[in-house]
Every structure is written in C-alpha cells, then in structure tokens.
Amino acid sequence: KSISIEIFGLGYVGFPLTVRLASAGFQVTGIDVNQERIQRLENNKLMDSEIHLEKEYIDCRQKNNIKLESKPSNSTIPKVGIICVPTPIPTKNISSDIFVKSAVESFLNCSKPGDVIILESSIEVGTTEIISNIIKNRGFEVGKNFGVCFCPERIDPSNKEWGIENIPRVIYCSDNSSFDIAKGIYLHVNGGNLLKVNSPKIAEIVKSFENAFR
C-alpha cells in the first residue's frame, strides 16, 4: 500500500482506526500531543475500553505497522493525514475547531503536493471550507495538487450492533483523485460503504443532524 497514513488524535475515534488500518497492512503513524498517552501506548498499556484491541495492536506493533509520535514527519511517498482530534464545546476564549486547525497546521508543516487531509472530527458547518483556505494559504491548490475530504466519524460507544467496521459513512472530497485514495482506505475500515456528496456543507449538516438526534 503505497501511501503513508498519519492519524491525529488517539482517542476513542483515532485509536481503533489506527489499529484497523495497520492490521490491513498500511504503515500508520499515530500522533497525539498527550505525551503520557504516547508513553502508555509505547508500553502496550491500553484503556479499559480498548482491551478488546490489545492483541491486534501488539501484533501491529511487532510488524512495525504502527509508529507513535507527537508530531508528523516528512515522507517521500504520498501521505494522508486523518484528523480525529476532539472538538471542545466553544467558549469565549476557545473555538470548537481549535484542535482541528492545530492538527491541520501540524500536518501541513511536513506536507507536499499530492498529499490528502481527511477530517473525521465533529466540526461546525463551514469548517471544511475554512480548512481548505488554510491549505491554500500554504501555497497548495486544493482539488488540484492537494486533497481535502470530510468523512465524519459515527462511533457510538454504547452501540454493540453498529461499529467502525460496518457503519455506513458520508464523505465529501475536493476531487476524484482524493476520493479514490479515501475509498481505498475506507475499504479496509467499513468495506468502502461510503455515500459521496458534492458539497462539504452537506456532509457537515449530516453530522450535525446525527449529533442532535443522539
């Protein structure tokens, strides 16, 4: 699999995704700014809610399919950054997309033409466009030499019937090439069960509606 994947945020969304993609044979770097979390994972210490992934995780580590870092690195092969960081409730001093923007900026520090960002974090309507503008300000042409996708996570921790491996996903991509890359990744997540939409706001509204429904 001739791409490198960096997953930002190793919480209840990013960690299972890291393990699933590494098990499929991808080279995955799990990135988290929480040094304690990185250290615990280096020592194979998982949270109680992750124990069911322990054997699979350790197998992936032994095969060197998972690296753990606090920041991204340069790569000579095409790179995909999947953003799974938390989105806090906004306050007067903190916007809900502060961690998303920080992760994107971090990824862009080591990016090159041909790379792709996939947003999975819960974001407000209009955020994908904001992220696209951040990328453009770095000199990239979104949809031409740099891809942006929004494929909102749909994990419901209490739901035993529907999980990361079988729940359908909605996805927006800036261009067909990025969609092909994303589909190749999610083929190993949920069998590629993706509903493609032609506007980021549609995907954002779908996610907002689901959050409100829950």
Predicted regions located by residue number:
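Structural/interface elements that position substrates and couple domains in central-metabolism enzymes
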Residues: 1-214
